[in-house]
Structures are given as C-alpha cells and as structure tokens.
Amino acid sequence: VKICDLTQFYSPRSGGVKRYLQEKIAYIRNYSPDDKHVLIVPGPRTDVTTNGVSRVYSIHAPVVSRRSQYRALLNLRAVEEILGQERPDLIESSDPYQVGWKAVAAGRALKVPVVGFYHSHFPEAYLRGRTKFLGERGAERAMKWTRAYVRRLYNRFQATLVASDKLAGVLSEWGVHNVRSTRLGVDTGIFKPAPDDTEGTRDRLGIKDEEKLLLYVGRLAKEKNTLTLCRSFELLHRRHPNEFRLVVVGDGPQRNELRKLQRNSCRSSIKWIAYCECAVELASLYRAADLFVHPGVQETFGLAALESQACGTPVVGIGGSYMDSVICHNQESWAQENSPEALATAIEEYSAKKLSVLGRNASRVARSLYSWPKVFEELFCIYRELRANYRRF
C-alpha cells in the first residue's frame, strides 16, 4: 500500500503532527516494509528527498510564524501534480483548511479513499474566548457556522480519525458520520523511566534537591492556555518563594508573558528552553521533573503529557478536556476550573502526594497501551479496511 500524508501543520521545529508523521515513517520502515509512504509538506523551497521508505515533497510556501517556522501551503496545483505523479492508494490529510479540500478533490480524481485526521479542535481553540469581541450572539453564530463547516468538510472523507473518544462523540453529535476513534503513541524506547539521570539533569539546570521541579513542554500560545500557566506559577512563587522551579520547553506568540514573569518576580525560578530537538534530552527533562504541568483545556490528545508519564513523571492540569483519557493515574486533585488560582492549588495538592509511586504506575500503563507499533498496527488495519470497502465507480 502506498500512503500519502498531506499537511501544512509541519514545522522543522517539531510539533505533534510532525512527531506523528515521523513515527509513522519509522513504523513502515521497521514493521511494514512492503508499504510505501509519500509526505507532502510546505517548506522554504520546492524540493524532494527520499528517506528510505518515504519520499518527502517540500513545496515552497510563505512563513506564517517566523518563530515556529509554520508555513501556509498555498500552491495547490503543485500538490495536485505530485499526487497525480505518485498515485497513492490512500491519502491522509491533517488539515481542516484549503489543503483538506484539495485532498478530497484529489482523492475523487484518483479514485482512492481519503482520510481526515482531526488533530486540532480548531472551533474551540479559536472561537472560545472571542465572545467579548463578537458578543454572545455573534460568538454563537460563529460557532454554528464552524460546526456546519466541519460537517461539510469531514463528511467528504471516507473516515475522520480522532485521537479522543470524547471528541469523537462531539463530532458525531455535530453530524460528522464517519468518525473513527484512534490513538497517538509514545516512543517507549526513548521515553522510559531508565536511565536514572535525574541528579545530573537537575544539577545542570541548577535545581536543588529540596525544590519541586515543574515542567511544561509545548507551544506558548493562547490555545495552549499558557497564560494561565504563567499566572499560576506567579501565585505559587508568592506563596512558596523557594519551593518550586519551572522549566518551560517551547516557543510561541505568548513568549513575552513568560519573559515578563522572568524579568519581574520569578527571575531565578524559571528556565526557558525555546526548542529541544533531541528526544533523548527531552526524556531526561521529563524524568528530572517532579510534576508535568498541562494547562491546556482544548487538547485533542496530549502527546507531551503521555511522554511525561511514560518517563515516570505524573501530570497535573485542568480537568474536563479531551485528553483526560490519556492520563494514566487518578486526577482527583486536578483543577476543576480554568483559572490560575485553581491550577496553583492543584499543583500544591499534587506536590504533597507520593509522586514516585504515581509516576511508576502511570509509566507502566502508558508504555503498555500507547507504544507506537501498537497504535500504527491498529491504524493500518483501518487503512486496509477503507481500501477494501472503497467504491471506485
């Protein structure tokens, strides 16, 4: 089977979609060598490279964000030409905008099934919180229009993949009739409790034995709720001046809020790492942390939270999001409202628990349920089923 992945959510500076695609290529190489893979993404120049089982097409596209290096894939004619040349057996689109529509049209022209992966719940991510600008009635109309858009696009796919049972239920309620629940995974060869390099990592970061190390990994952006993270840590620092340290790995439009916090009251208590390219180094940071803080309330899955648990570090956050199902330990002390005060209190309560025991148990569950080979074995069964049942005429 030749599978083509098509997305504009692809940055050289990592990201969940990029991680998923890299792991898919690794799975084909190691476990399904008879299959072939094509990847079409935006880039600084038009180019094609071969990476073992995968051929990667980069199409010149303008930069949307210089920091994250995300680009808008606007040259849809080039996409069409590549698909016509490669003639894949199945197309998967990770994009809810113009690239998604192009994938649907190309699938019909080539008479092959097209799958949509609903990686981001963009209606909530971008419309919630706009009420003060649109007014309640305007926001309600915008959400109604967005739901209709989601129905119109995703019902054109042969299947809509969603990595959250709860979100799959939401899309079904909205009228998307082809929803299939799936999962994302974790590289259990890298994200694991061993080796015990905690002492060396904490020394390198300047963290004392008696200090509680909090870790956040992800974009600094409104949809990730990082402003709540910053304000909750400011509260913690005021309440317990020498007890907590925060390491932030990631960059994004809300970086200035973090810098402001560093400049003002929390200068020596926050370390910011804009980008961590090495997965082994990232795993060391997860293992060194006492708690992983996940402030997001609109996540569809939560890869970083899963990686942290696989390394033996429990997660604290705000309850009720679509990623609750990937938390492999109890959430009884999680914040029950989206506020800095509630998140700060949840961190305080969790810090009093036996975190090493929680972490060990969570690691065992995460590594057994969410290994990438297991995830892709299930996903490729869906691919083959869709191909077998696809009506070409």
Model-derived segments and spans:
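Donor nucleotide-sugar binding/catalytic pocket of nucleotide-sugar-dependent glycosyltransferases
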Residues: Y57, E140-D197
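Short alpha-helical donor nucleotide-sugar binding micro-motif in glycosyltransferases
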Residues: L83, Y154, Y275, S284-A289
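Nucleotide-activated donor-binding/catalytic signature segment of Leloir-type glycosyltransferases, i.e.
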Residues: N256-C276, V280
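Aromatic "clamp/platform" in nucleotide-sugar-dependent glycosyltransferases that forms part
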Residues: V297
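Short hydrophobic beta-strand element within catalytic cores of glycosyltransferases
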Residues: P314-G317
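Conserved acidic donor-binding segment of nucleotide-sugar-dependent glycosyltransferases
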Residues: H329-E341, E348-K354
